[in-house]
Amino acid sequence: MNRHHLQDHFLEIDKKNCCVFRDDFIAKVLPPVLGLEFIFGLLGNGLALWIFCFHLKSWKSSRIFLFNLAVADFLLIICLPFVMDYYVRRSDWKFGDIPCRLVLFMFAMNRQGSIIFLTVVAVDRYFRVVHPHHALNKISNWTAAIISCLLWGITVGLTVHLLKKKLLIQNGTANVCISFSICHTFRWHEAMFLLEFFLPLGIILFCSARIIWSLRQRQMDRHAKIKRAITFIMVVAIVFVICFLPSVVVRIHIFWLLHTSGTQNCEVYRSVDLAFFITLSFTYMNSMLDPVVYYFSSPSFPNFFSTLINRCLQRKITGEPDNNRSTSVELTGDPNKTRGAPEALIANSGEPWSPSYLGPTSNNHSKKGHCHQEPASLEKQLGCCIE
């Protein structure tokens, strides 16, 4: 490898010598992968937001947090086409400096937002199961909305620095748009990239382990609804690890190489730089997989799809429009299917989707308001009126 070719990878960023690569492999492989993530993520999160906004008949704190998670994922997904175009052009940004800053800010903000709200969902379920009588389980929807706004404020505060400086850098004939680079320095931005993973990871693993242990101690893990709840908890942890761990591991390896080798020979970093951008696609995949979290969060979501599919099939068979039914598909949960399962785990599948639940004469509503009078067998062990 001649010296001239090695120098091609050097780029001065903020008066520091950095290594920057424009890899043909990324240009060929990542755009199709990101395209699939965009399609499935847009469909999944778009449908989730549609259900939240138009078919949810009442709100609870846990659903407010899930709604914010869906918003974060949706905002990240709509930025993917710009990144796809960037990779197709072999890391050559054609939209100018301000759009470059905005897209990188949106990616960083919504990546962090997804992490934060996944963590909040795990903590919320932890308190409802392990500490069912804790005051946090009784927070109002208004309080949950304020907490969500504060979390968004923290997220914006930690990523707004990406809007303040120029991130579009001339690299030969190409314009490179990057917020992460291989430089012999450890910046605050990169430190946060690691901290925002390991701290939530510890919290999510702790909450998941305590919930499963608590249920098994009370010999409740064999109940069908409890098994579904345990599946939900495990899905949250698995999605988090699969999507965010690979890029963090590669970034740590880059820091180690910088500490031991410096930036004198950029060829040392070619493979790890390629690995980092590939693992970043796993990060974007989080927005595609989070709808699985919504699906397992409550029987209401699969019930909704079952109801929608059944109505569509019925109309197709009869060949006539269903004029006697509302064009809005609403779920009416089956209380017989959910009786006896802890509310903290099944998220009240039988009530918020049904308009009758809101009626003053609803028996379900009456029992929920005075559940200490006739608690179900499993609710006695977990505590009632916890959601």
Curated annotation (Swiss-Prot):
The reply to whether Translocase figures as a keyword in the UniProt entry is no
A biological-process GO annotation: G protein-coupled receptor signaling pathway
The UniProt entry's sequence similarity note says: Belongs to the G-protein coupled receptor 1 family.
Give me the Gene Ontology terms describing cellular component.
cell junction; plasma membrane
Topology of this chain in the membrane:
Multi-pass membrane protein
* Localisation per UniProt entry: Cell membrane
Q: State the protein's name.
A: Hydroxycarboxylic acid receptor 3
Q: Does the keyword Transmembrane apply?
A: yes
Q: Which cysteines are joined by disulfide bonds?
A: 100-177
Q: What does this protein do?
A: Receptor for 3-OH-octanoid acid mediates a negative feedback regulation of adipocyte lipolysis to counteract prolipolytic influences under conditions of physiological or pathological increases in beta-oxidation rates. Acts as a low affinity receptor for nicotinic acid. This pharmacological effect requires nicotinic acid doses that are much higher than those provided by a normal diet.
UniProt topological domain (Extracellular) ranges:
1-28, 86-102, 164-194, 257-273
Keywords from UniProt, A to Z, are: Cell membrane, Disulfide bond, G-protein coupled receptor, Membrane, Receptor, Transducer, Transmembrane, Transmembrane helix
Task: Provide the GO MF annotations for this entry.
Answer: G protein-coupled receptor activity; nicotinic acid receptor activity
* Superkingdom as given in the UniProt entry: Eukaryota
Q: What is its main location?
A: membrane
List the source organism.
Homo sapiens (Human)
Describe tissue expression.
Expression largely restricted to adipose tissue and spleen.
